[in-house]
Amino acid sequence: LQKGLQLSFFRSRKLSDQEYFFNSYFDELSVRLRDVSADQLGELSQVFVNVRDKGGKVIIIGNGGSAAIASHVAVDLTKAARVRAINFNEADLITCFGNDYGYENWMGKALEFYSDAGDVAVIISSSGESQNVVIGAKAARDLGLQVVTLSGFRADNSLRAIGHLNLWVNSESYNIVETTHQSWLLAVIDRLVEAGQ
C-alpha cells in the first residue's frame, strides 16, 4: 500500500482479503466523490464558461500526480470544451524557474510571466500544504486572477483558505484524493460538452 494511506476502514479487517479491500476502497471513493455539491461543480462550470467568453485562459498547476491531472484536464478543456487551458509541466520551464527563483517560488513566477488579466488559475494539491503551490496560489491572487483550488487531507489546509472557489476531499489517501479531483474536473468538462456550452 502507498505510504501514508490512513483510511481507517482498511484496518478493520486484514488486507489479505482482497475482495473486502477493493469493495471498501471503491465504497470510500464513491463517498468522497460526493464531498462536493452539484452547485459547486456548477459554479466551476460557469467559471470556465466566463473565462472562455472573455477570451481568457485557464492555467492548471500542481505537483506530481496533481501535475498529471493538470495535463489531462488542460487538454480536455481545450479540445472538448473549447476553453483554452495550459499547464506548467515542461521540464525546462520548471528547472529554469526553479533554478533562478527557488523551487518554492517557481509556480508563482511562472504565473507572473504567463498569465494575463482575466485568466483563471486552477491549483491542485492533495495536502494543500506544498510550499510552491501555496506561494503560487497567493501569487495568483496578487496578480488578480480568479483562483480555484482543489485539495484534500486537513479541512484547514493552507491552500483551501486562498481560493475564490475551494473544492476539498475529506480523505488523507493520496490516490483517493487525486482520483476524486480528476473525476470532478472531468465531470465539469463533460457537463459543458453536454450542455453545448
List each model region and its residues:
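Short, glycine/polar-rich helix-capping loops at beta-to-alpha or helix-loop-helix junctions
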Residues: 150-163
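A short, well-structured juxtamembrane/interface segment
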Residues: 34-54
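Short beta->alpha connector loops at strand-helix junctions that form conserved
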Residues: 89, 125, 151, 167-175
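Generic N-terminal amphipathic, Lys/Arg-enriched alpha-helix
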Residues: 5-36, 172
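Short glycine/serine/threonine-rich phosphate/pyrophosphate-binding segments
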Residues: 66-71, 129-136
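Surface-exposed amphipathic alpha-helices with a cationic face
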Residues: 78, 137-141
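Glycine-rich, small/polar surface segments that engage phosphate groups of diverse ligands
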Residues: 47-115, 120
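A charged, well-structured terminal subsegment
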Residues: 121, 175-197
